[in-house]
Amino acid sequence: MYAVFQSGGKQHRVSEGQTVRLEKLDIATGEAVEFDLVLMVANGEEIKIGVPYVDGGKIKAEVVAHGRGEKVKIVKFRRRKHYRKQAGHRQWFTDVKITGISA
């Protein structure tokens, strides 16, 4: 059984027991979280596709950890003008473990 849900402006395909890295959620580590923006649920041959969301579709998960991703370097440069700028960015994330899928 697997499902596709929406979180943080992105879509994720998950199955039970899987750990997924999402955009930062303001929920403490170890707490349960429930996602109700389920786009699709598949159980063997039976597939439910939402318009846009599946009625009664829920994904239960547990927050495992919070952290920051790898640094991305941003460089602005203009040739012959002695103009260079550098910046860096590290995006916050939340790791969640999927504990249940229902539709």
UniProtKB/Swiss-Prot annotation:
Keyword Transmembrane helix among record annotations: no
Domain of life of the source: Bacteria
Gene Ontology cellular-component terms listed: cytoplasm; ribonucleoprotein complex; ribosome
InterPro entries for this protein: bL21-like, bL21-like_sf, Ribosomal_bL21, Ribosomal_bL21_CS
PANTHER family: 50S RIBOSOMAL PROTEIN L21, LARGE RIBOSOMAL SUBUNIT PROTEIN BL21M
Similarity remark: Belongs to the bacterial ribosomal protein bL21 family.
Subunit structure: Part of the 50S ribosomal subunit. Contacts protein L20.
HAMAP family, A to Z: Ribosomal_bL21
Protein name from the UniProt record: Large ribosomal subunit protein bL21
Organism of provenance: Pectobacterium atrosepticum (strain SCRI 1043 / ATCC BAA-672) (Erwinia carotovora subsp. atroseptica)
Underlying gene: rplU
